[in-house]
Every structure is written in C-alpha cells, then in structure tokens.
Amino acid sequence: MAVYTEVSDAALAEFLSAYAIGSLLSFKGIAEGVENSNFFLHTTEGAYILTLYEKRVREQDLPFFIGLMEHLSARGLACPQPVRDRAGQALGQLCGRPAAIVSFLEGVSVKAPGAEHCRELGRALAELHAAGRDFPMVRENNLSVSAWRPLFAQAEAQADSVEPGLAARTRSDLAVLEAHWPRDLPGGVIHADLFTDNVFFIGDALSGLIDFYFACTDAFAYDLAVCLNAWCFDPDGTFHRDMAAALIAGYEAVRPLEAAEVAALPILCRGAALRFMLTRLVDWLNVPPGALVKPKDPREFDRRLTFHRQARDARDYGRPH
C-alpha cells in the first residue's frame, strides 16, 4: 500500500457522500507498498480502507478483484469486504482514478515471522485456493513467465548499476525458466502477492489476508512458491528451512500437493523470485518524483535466486518425500 495521488478534503467529502458509512472522523495516507494509493478512513460507523487504483492496475481488471473479495468473504475467508454505495456500486471515481472502499481488518502484519506463522499462512493459502474454486471469473496472470523478458527489457541497460552481474544472471535465469516452466499444474484463483505485509495476525493466530490486486488464475503451487520466497528468507538471502517446512505442511494439511507440483517446486520458486526481482528493479529505477512511497530493494530477490539455482528438489525446501 502507498500514496501516489493526493486527495483533497473537498474531493473526499463529495466521494463519501455516495456511501452510507457515517460521518468522516479522520483520514490518513498509508506509505507502505508499491501499487495503489491507500488511505485509512475512520467514520462514525467504523474503520475502512479507501483505495485509488493507479496506472499499473488495469481498470478492466477491477471487477475481478472486487468480485473475488466478495466471493471469498462470503465463503468465510477473512479478507476485505468491498463496500457498495447507495446505488449498489462497488467502484467509483476519485481524483481521476477508479476508487473503492473496503472493510478494515483487525490485526497486524508480523515483521519477523516464525515457523508457526508460516504454518498458519500455509493453511490460509490452501483455504483461499479451495474457497476460490467456484469463482466464475478468470484473469490471466500478466506477470508470469511470458512477461518477464519484456519487464527485463525496461531495466536491462541499468541493471548492473544496481548490482554487478545482475544483467547476465537475469538473462541466464530467463533462458532456463522459459525452457522449463511447468504447464498444466492444478490451478484456479491465486493471490500471487502474499508477502508479510498482506497477512494480518492477532497474537499468533492469522486474522486476515489483504491486497488482492495481483490475484489471478494460475497454478496453486506458484502461489505457494511466492509465499516461500516472501516468508522464508532473510533480506541477506539466508533461507530458513524450518519455516518453509512449516509453510508447506500447513498448506498440505488442507490440500495435499500432487506429485507434479512437488517436482515443480524448485523451478516455481526460481520463477517467483525472478518475477519480484524484475518488478522491484523496474520500480527502483522509476520512482515517481515526490511520491510518498518506499521503493523495495530488488537485490533481496537476486540473493534468493542464488539459493533457487542450486535447489535440486522439494527436499531442499523442507518437504520430505
């Protein structure tokens, strides 16, 4: 979550007049994250999140995201519930951007997760996959393997200024991943961005999942690979096998992996790491001037890739055969 578009008091008041959510008490921008402009809203009726969708989010995808959150919430998954206005619409316009209000989830993200947090996450991820099985809409993953080379083209000339040798390593990774990317794995709705700041806990109990704006239709095991990258490494590239084992075990307690998914885990983890390295690299080199935003370091995923290149099978990620 971040702020790219500033919202005036007058514009906000006009926008909120369409909603039956009480009178505004306070309004504050959220500086975390990288995709949209997000604000805390506190009203006489409760707490909400207001999101203005910025340019990387395609407007035609918004009905998928809004519909998915409503679908998952209706099936008992703890996620933001879109708030519809008095006319029954979940999407509006604010400051020239598409905008929506969703319910506020209680809990906090965990900055230094342990194995039990990872086990909880694995279980919640499998429950998300199960809850989304009958969701009727489809959205292609537009940040999967076919998108990585075009992304790299935007940053290739400057890559080595961020980290020496990064361009050559990325070219090698792309060649391997494009040749060996698995097809036809079990799939459906995935979150695709379940980093620690998108998962809330109250104590050690998982209380909610947020930020569904990369959700798409893809392989379930790829979503697991994203989580392994996001939760089980330190910024210096140190891998925590106990956390990975707990994450996978939590997932398989709800949905056991098929043999093809287990076999594909190393290549999926390598691809997931490259995907986040590339989007971070492009963002690192193109931060809008004056934006209230914290660009994330692509080198963290370059370090993770060192581990993934050496991984032989799922045992290296803590899953016993």
From Swiss-Prot:
<keyword id="KW-0791">Threonine biosynthesis</keyword>
<comment type="pathway">
    <text>Amino-acid biosynthesis; L-threonine biosynthesis; L-threonine from L-aspartate: step 4/5.</text>
</comment>
<dbReference type="InterPro" id="IPR050249">
    <property type="entry name" value="Pseudomonas-type_ThrB"/>
</dbReference>
<comment type="similarity">
    <text>Belongs to the pseudomonas-type ThrB family.</text>
</comment>
<dbReference type="GO" id="GO:0005524">
    <property type="term" value="F:ATP binding"/>
</dbReference>
<keyword id="KW-0418">Kinase</keyword>
<keyword id="KW-0067">ATP-binding</keyword>
<keyword id="KW-0028">Amino-acid biosynthesis</keyword>
<dbReference type="InterPro" id="IPR005280">
    <property type="entry name" value="Homoserine_kinase_II"/>
</dbReference>
<keyword id="KW-0547">Nucleotide-binding</keyword>
<dbReference type="InterPro" id="IPR011009">
    <property type="entry name" value="Kinase-like_dom_sf"/>
</dbReference>
<dbReference type="Pfam" id="PF01636">
    <property type="entry name" value="APH"/>
</dbReference>
<dbReference type="GO" id="GO:0009088">
    <property type="term" value="P:threonine biosynthetic process"/>
</dbReference>
<dbReference type="GO" id="GO:0004413">
    <property type="term" value="F:homoserine kinase activity"/>
</dbReference>
<dbReference type="InterPro" id="IPR002575">
    <property type="entry name" value="Aminoglycoside_PTrfase"/>
</dbReference>
<protein>
    <recommendedName>
        <fullName>Homoserine kinase</fullName>
        <ecNumber>2.7.1.39</ecNumber>
    </recommendedName>
</protein>
<keyword id="KW-0808">Transferase</keyword>
